[in-house]
């Protein structure tokens, strides 16, 4: 109803997620420049297994993770399950006519989820005329994802796990939903925090979500965020 609520507090702790926190802090500091939102570019792949994979879980966790020595990418592999096939149909309704076929063959499907390091981030946020624009720019990142997917395919095929059939889907920049790194530790700009996660020049404001981290190599960083929140909680 366009109403403002004003309250006074000695300390304010933000743990509302990178996008929401970044919007609030940008607005608070009146920052108008473009801010890069770091994330892990993603590629989905599905392979056809030579043998059916039997399991009893409705949702099968990752059975195998493959990481490059340099940390440039990692991939997790898991068998198909009803939750995955239903999610595919929800996201891409044009697969509805073959829903029965997808569910019938899902025990021969191996799904791969490839994530790149944060150097390939391509999501930005900027405040323009009191509104926030979130956007991406033209990039050739899909070429890198396809290249690494070929490595996964060769590994599975050479070990006689799959047939030479696969399908890939690049959902676009930001579709990984691993957003972080907008308000990093010890940056020179106003958008930064100290070792106690206090906002620069505003030490009554604490930020404890993914905004403060650069998870360049760690593609599954939830544990780090939780551990840091507990650390800051003890300091308070």
PLM regions: where:
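An active-site-proximal "capping" alpha-helix that borders the catalytic cofactor pocket
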Residues: 153, 223-236
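Short, conserved micro-motifs enriched in small and acidic residues
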Residues: 15, 142-143, 216-223, 227
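Short, well-ordered alpha-helix to beta-strand connector turns
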Residues: 8-10, 202-203
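Short helix/loop capping segments that flank catalytic or ligand/cofactor-binding pockets
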Residues: 22-24, 123, 194, 215-217
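N-terminal export/assembly segments and adjacent metallocofactor-ligating motifs
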Residues: 58, 149, 234-235
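Mid-to-C-terminal "cap/lid" subdomains and adjacent gly/pro-rich loops that border
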Residues: 3, 10-118
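A glycine-rich dinucleotide-binding beta-alpha-beta segment and adjacent secondary-structure elements
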Residues: 147-216, 222
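C-terminal catalytic lobe of FAD-dependent flavoproteins
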Residues: 93-163
